[in-house]
Amino acid sequence: MLIRGRAIVYGDKIDTDVIIPAKYLVYTDPAILGQHAMEPIDPEFPKKAKGAILVAGRAFGMGSSREQAAIALKGAGVLAVVAESFARIFYRNAINVGLPVLQAPGVRAKVREGDELEVDLTGGVVRNLTTGEAIQGKPLAGLPLEILKAGGLLQYLKNRA
């Protein structure tokens, strides 16, 4: 499963309160949530997110277990999130809502804002097409990959019914 897009880069410990502030949790529409994604640290994020790959450092998605964090990123048009490490609950929520995620230690230091990336989920490789570098991450396989291919957990379950 290959995903291509330009990089939007953030640092370590981006928590779910930053990804989608609590005051917007009253909304359920992914597009509305997406308009407010990353608002506390990057008010321009919604303009940059469509067709982008979000790259981050360690502990991306830490904090509360709000599913809306992954929904907001997907609603903003993010194609995938690649981080050095993830909070496990965010990682599972992302897969469950159909937002591709890949853990790739060292990725943050090798990608700059605007670089063109290709993410191979099954091989676990992030290719920086701008610099020619490849970063080996942890490949996705088994049920998590099948859920992503289906478009999320609900669609996966519907397909099996």
UniProtKB/Swiss-Prot annotation:
EC class name: lyase
Gene3D superfamilies, per the entry: Aconitase, domain 4
MF-aspect GO terms: 3-isopropylmalate dehydratase activity
Record's catalysed reaction(s): (2R,3S)-3-isopropylmalate = (2S)-2-isopropylmalate
CDD domains per UniProt: IPMI_Swivel
UniProt key word Lyase: yes
Pathway: Amino-acid biosynthesis; L-leucine biosynthesis; L-leucine from 3-methyl-2-oxobutanoate: step 2/4
Keywords: Amino-acid biosynthesis, Branched-chain amino acid biosynthesis, Leucine biosynthesis, Lyase
EC number: 4.2.1.33
Pfam families xref list: Aconitase_C
GO biological process, one term: L-leucine biosynthetic process
InterPro entries: Aconitase/3IPM_dehydase_swvl, AconitaseA/IPMdHydase_ssu_swvl, IPMI_Swivel, LeuD, LeuD_type2/HacB/DmdB
Keyword Amino-acid biosynthesis attached: yes
Task performed by this protein: Catalyzes the isomerization between 2-isopropylmalate and 3-isopropylmalate, via the formation of 2-isopropylmaleate.
Similarity annotation: Belongs to the LeuD family. LeuD type 2 subfamily.
Subunit structure: Heterodimer of LeuC and LeuD.
Protein name: 3-isopropylmalate dehydratase small subunit
Gene expressing this chain: leuD
